[in-house]
């Protein structure tokens, strides 16, 4: 059941239903009733709201959250989290129910302070820029319908249909095939804007777009953990394991469907788009956790691709030296003890792969550059340039 918390100045009133508090004073409410909402309110003391992320079926602390605040016009409130859940530029804020977003300002930590304007009757706060199926629908609606096809990957265990789309050469006989996935971990939303940028260049009225449409078929699954995305789940660390550790036993129909898509397409390139830890050392830069070099189909090709991506990167900086080699930091076999990732399954089961890559897009800050929808789209556009250059170089 959704829970709404009401408080009046220093008084605390918590209700487990959506009934209104009957009072003559201005009532402030804090709840998770917004798209992909996720918050637990523990208490309110004076002008401080004590909150924490709703882990649900996640087996460890994770930092995603989204909350709605109403009735706080003219007030200054402090939001204090149980764990470090505020990103490098503070929360993402919208005062118009998701039409526009901005960073409120701040730094990585447990708290943020927000002064509500006199007309801000309802404000949504998120840990990061959200990206939901309605955003995907809006994006694809703006594209030339002749340049792509849409379909359904499969149905989730709850019966939701997972969208997919194909761009580029639609003949079925493209010289090169690429499969790109997003949201194996439900809360890693900023990476979807990079997916948009890649697609934009596949559809562009340009020499690059023309070459891609003649030579490359791009299959895209924007939301692997679709249910988790719409429900506002953490996604990472689900029990008994999350979607990107499900390529051993296939508990989730969507991961089985992705593996079948790989087997059907026999891609030369696989891209799996992710986001790292919320902030801090190693998490505020675009990077790629590399596979075991003993398993990589073509180490020289992977090195070449990194060099090309670094050269062409725009919007967000990327340096090949920031990649995490296998066996370093968290990128070890222990991290995959609960099951294979999509990439590990692919290199074990597919022939002809040249590139099998995960890109980690930071949530808010990339080597000092602000990570936002447009800077991330621009990075995606540069990735499309790099994909074309790599394939042309490899011919």
PLM features per residue range, with description:
Residues 14-23:
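Bacterial Sec-dependent signal peptides at the C-terminal "C-region" and cleavage site
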Residues 107-146:
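Extended acidic/polar, glycine-enriched regions
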Residues 125, 194-199, 379-387:
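Short amphipathic C-terminal alpha-helix that caps PH/PH-like domains
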Residues 150-167, 172-349, 353-367:
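Active-site/substrate-binding loop(s) of hydrolase catalytic cores
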């Amino acid at each position: 059941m959704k829970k709404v918390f009401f408080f009046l100045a220093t008084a605390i009133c918590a209700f487990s239903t959506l009934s209104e508090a009957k009072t003559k004073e201005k009532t402030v409410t804090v709840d998770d009733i917004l798209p992909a909402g996720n918050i637990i309110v523990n208490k309110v003391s004076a002008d401080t709201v004590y909150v924490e992320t709703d882990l649900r079926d996640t087996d460890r602390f994770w930092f995603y959250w989204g909350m709605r605040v109403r009735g706080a016009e003219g007030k200054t409130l402090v939001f204090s989290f149980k764990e470090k859940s505020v990103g490098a530029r503070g929360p993402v804020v919208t005062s118009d129910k998701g039409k526009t977003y901005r960073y409120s300002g701040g730094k990585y930590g447990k708290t943020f302070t927000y002064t509500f304007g006199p007309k801000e009757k309802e404000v949504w706060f998120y840990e990061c820029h959200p990206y939901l199926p309605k955003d995907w629908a809006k994006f694809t609606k703006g594209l030339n319908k002749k340049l792509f096809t849409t379909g359904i990957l499969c149905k989730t265990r709850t019966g939701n249909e997972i969208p997919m789309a194909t761009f580029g050469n639609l003949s079925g006989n493209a010289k090169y095939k690429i499969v790109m996935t997003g949201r194996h971990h439900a809360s890693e939303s900023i990476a979807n804007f990079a997916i948009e940028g890649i697609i934009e260049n596949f559809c562009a009225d340009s020499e690059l777009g023309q070459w891609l449409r003649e030579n490359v078929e791009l299959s895209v699954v924007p939301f692997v953990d679709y249910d988790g995305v719409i429900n506002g789940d953490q996604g990472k660390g689900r029990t008994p394991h999350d979607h990107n550790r499900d390529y051993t036993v296939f508990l989730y129909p969507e991961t089985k469907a992705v593996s079948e898509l790989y087997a059907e397409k026999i891609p030369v390139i696989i891209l799996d788009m992710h986001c790292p830890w919320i902030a801090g050392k190693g998490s505020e830069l675009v990077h790629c956790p590399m596979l075991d070099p003993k398993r990589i189909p073509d180490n020289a090709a992977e090195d070449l691709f990194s060099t090309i991506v670094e050269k062409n990167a725009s919007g967000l900086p990327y340096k090949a030296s920031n990649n995490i080699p296998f066996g370093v930091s968290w990128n070890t076999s222990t991290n995959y003890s609960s099951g294979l990732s999509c990439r590990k399954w692919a290199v074990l089961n597919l022939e002809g792969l040249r590139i099998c890559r995960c890109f980690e897009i930071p949530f808010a800050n990339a080597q000092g550059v602000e990570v936002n929808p447009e800077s991330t789209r621009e990075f995606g556009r540069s990735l499309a340039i790099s994909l074309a250059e790599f394939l042309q170089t490899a011919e």
